[in-house]
Swiss-Prot record:
Region span, Disordered: 1-47, 364-417
Effect of residue 397 to D: Leads to a prolonged S phase and a shortened passage through G1
Record-listed cross-link Glycyl lysine isopeptide (Lys-Gly) (interchain with G-Cter in ubiquitin), residues: 50
List of residues that carry Phosphothreonine: 20, 24, 53
Chain positions found as Phosphoserine: 27, 69, 76, 82, 98, 104, 140, 159, 177, 397
Effect annotated for changing residue 159 to A: Significant reduction in phosphorylation. Complete inhibition of phosphorylation. Leads to a prolonged S phase and a shortened passage through G1. Predominantly cytoplasmic
Residues covered by region (Interaction with NBA1): 143-362
Function: Acidic protein, which assembles histones into an octamer (in vitro). Involved in the regulation of the localization and the function of the septins during mitosis. Involved in the function of B-type cyclins.
Biased composition (Basic and acidic residues): 404-417
Domain notes: The acidic domains are probably involved in the interaction with histones.
Organism: Saccharomyces cerevisiae (strain ATCC 204508 / S288c)
Compartments, as annotated in UniProt: Cytoplasm; Nucleus; Bud neck
Gene name per UniProt: NAP1
Protein name as catalogued: Nucleosome assembly protein
Length: 417
């Protein structure tokens, strides 16, 4: 629903893959070779045959300063106006201006579409909530699953071949009274979070102890006229020895104006203050006790040295942009942290909360890997297509061209997703 985070200030943004007016067509400036052929190619080929082929890669590899200079010059040309648009006739420019007006009207319609989509998502969120609430009660042990739910679940896992969840005949015959009754599903949300790739690396051993008391993760959409969403982490405060909060929340805000692609753009996030019971239970800091002796009185006192450390619970204290004049390396580090923070929020909203049981069992990982493999295959296909295109530009032997002569033209293959 939203664009990836814009990590660069607007002043430094450039258009990727600039459209044709920024890269002037060769046919506009020079006579085309398509009909007349390249007048110097045959002569150059004869000279190459006489003196041998120069390997440009070897030359550049042996002269890194030259290579860097070329790269810098090429980089400065990206997005530069070639003058093509400026040289167009007046009546063509007027037509382009009218197209700009029409495009601005399209932006308004797209904004209306996104706003209504947001309202539709919020409408269906109200239908999700009763289901999520029952899920939460079963996880925490406040409610027992109904027999028909168990039977339906058995059919589902059989169809998906998730054999680990199947209850065999011996287990069915076992008397519930003979089996130790476990309240709810222990470590449900901790296990689900640790199976989500983008989150697992942020959870330390100390974090895991705290997340044992996590009872539910909820979602709300903002309805105060500004697009965004809120994640709510509900803890068992009566048993939690680490902090007193019942709920930890994280709110993500989108910009009011749409991005160029017609989607909402991430603006910023706001966390909440965690009321740790004491520094010893605060998993976001490292506590070191030091003894200090007074030189005059010779009295000894104990002081605490507190050092901030990496922790999942830093998620509730999101990174903030301090000023525009900060060091470039610090700016890049901040951008990476902002991008990671935004990605975690989106994946919790779009992946973890709707499919929590599959992240607990690990079944969701199989679908995740399948999607990654499909994307990798598509990237490889595109690279192969590009390679074939380059080969065609270099020219083919007469024998290869004759192989295709006289064959009926085949229809392009349809890719199915």
């Amino acid at each position: 629903m939203s664009d990836p985070i814009r990590t660069k200030p607007k002043s430094s943004m450039q258009i990727d893959n600039a459209p044709t007016p920024h890269n002037t067509p060769a046919s506009v400036l020079n006579p085309s070779y398509l009909k007349n052929g390249n007048p110097v190619r045959a002569q150059a080929q004869e000279q190459d045959d006489k003196i041998g082929t120069i390997n440009e890669e070897d030359i550049l590899a042996n002269q890194p300063l030259l290579l860097q200079s070329i790269q810098d010059r090429l980089g400065s040309l990206v997005g530069q106006d070639s003058g093509y648009v400026g040289g167009l006739p007046k009546n063509v420019k007027e037509k382009l201006l009218s197209l700009k007006t029409l495009q601005s009207e399209l932006f308004e319609v797209e904004k209306e579409f996104q706003v209504e989509m947001f309202e539709l998502e919020n409408k269906f969120l109200q239908k999700y909530k009763p289901i999520w609430e029952q899920r939460s009660r079963i996880i925490s042990g406040q409610e027992q699953p109904k027999p028909e739910q168990i039977a339906k679940g058995q059919e589902i896992v059989e169809s998906l071949n998730e054999t680990e969840l199947l209850v065999d005949e011996e287990e069915k015959a076992q008397n519930d009274s003979e089996e130790e009754q476990v309240k709810g599903i222990p470590s449900f949300w901790l296990t689900a979070l640790e199976n989500l790739p983008i989150v697992c690396d942020t959870i330390t051993d100390r974090d895991a102890e705290v997340l044992e008391y996590l009872q539910d993760i909820g979602l709300e959409y903002l309805t105060d006229g500004r697009p965004g969403f809120k994640l709510l982490f509900r803890f068992d405060s009566s048993a939690n020895p680490f902090f007193t909060n019942d709920i930890l929340c994280k709110t993500y805000f989108y910009q009011k104006e749409l991005g160029y692609s017609g989607d909402f753009i991430y603006d910023h996030a706001e966390g909440c203050e965690i009321s740790w019971k004491d520094n010893a239970h605060n998993v976001t800091v490292d506590l070191e006790m030091r003894k200090q002796r007074n030189k005059t009185t010779k009295q000894v006192r104990t002081i605490e040295k507190i050092t901030p450390i990496e922790s999942f619970f830093n998620f509730f204290d999101p990174p903030k942009i301090q000023n525009e004049d900060q060091d470039e390396e610090l700016e890049e580090d901040l951008e990476e942290r902002l991008a990671l923070d935004y990605s975690i929020g989106e994946q919790l909203k779009d992946k973890l909360i709707p499919r929590a049981v599959d992240w607990f069992t690990g079944a969701a990982l199989e679908f995740e890997f399948e999607e990654d493999e499909e994307e990798a295959d598509e990237d490889e296909d595109e690279e192969e297509d590009d390679d074939h295109g380059l080969e065609d530009d270099d020219g083919e032997s007469a024998e290869e061209q004759d192989d295709f002569a006289g064959r009926p033209e085949q229809a392009p293959e349809c890719k199915q997703s």
